[in-house]
Amino acid sequence: MEMQVQNIFIVDDNQLMVTDLKLHLQERFGASVKISTFENGESCLKKIDKDTHIVILDYFMEGKNGLDILKSIKEINPKTDVVMLTSNEDIVLAINAFRAGAKDYVIKGASAWKKIAKIIIHIITEPIRILVREFRISKFMAVFLLTFVTMGIIVLFAMYVIN
């Protein structure tokens, strides 16, 4: 099944870290991701829309902090998955982020990029896992059904546009 290109935003004021993470994700996911980067939350909010799938968001930045930006993202598009990224291991910050709708909370460090890649894989494959778990069908059948439904929607849309 061909996966939809995932629009990923990386928001952090540390440009070296942003460049490193972007390269890591591009190497890992290739053409299946489109990555946009932002130095602050305000510039990110101007670009968030219904097609923004994942935001990797630094907690501490100039201007509004990551928690405020997270809340604004969820107001604009509640379906956008937000991964908070921080160097602070404060449990209260993590709890507040989860309460505001964060999908995950990652501490910056040596294994952070691998963890973020695993989170993205988890987000992308969620529909398949739901079908397997809830309807007790094989993974092959779940992929087949999602492909069939997607193709059906495309055909119906094409017929609608033609007429």
Question: Residue locations for each model-derived region?
Answer:
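Active-site beta3 strand of CheY-like receiver
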Residues: 9, 50-56
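Active-site residues of response regulator receiver
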Residues: 12, 58-59
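Two-component/phosphorelay signaling modules centered on CheY-like receiver
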Residues: 15-36
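Receiver (REC) domain switch/output surface
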Residues: 24, 115-127
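Helix N-cap/capping motif at the beta->alpha junctions
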Residues: 37-43, 66
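The feature encodes the CheY-like receiver
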Residues: 62-63, 86, 90
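Short amphipathic alpha-helix used as the core "switch/output" element in two-component signaling
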Residues: 65-79
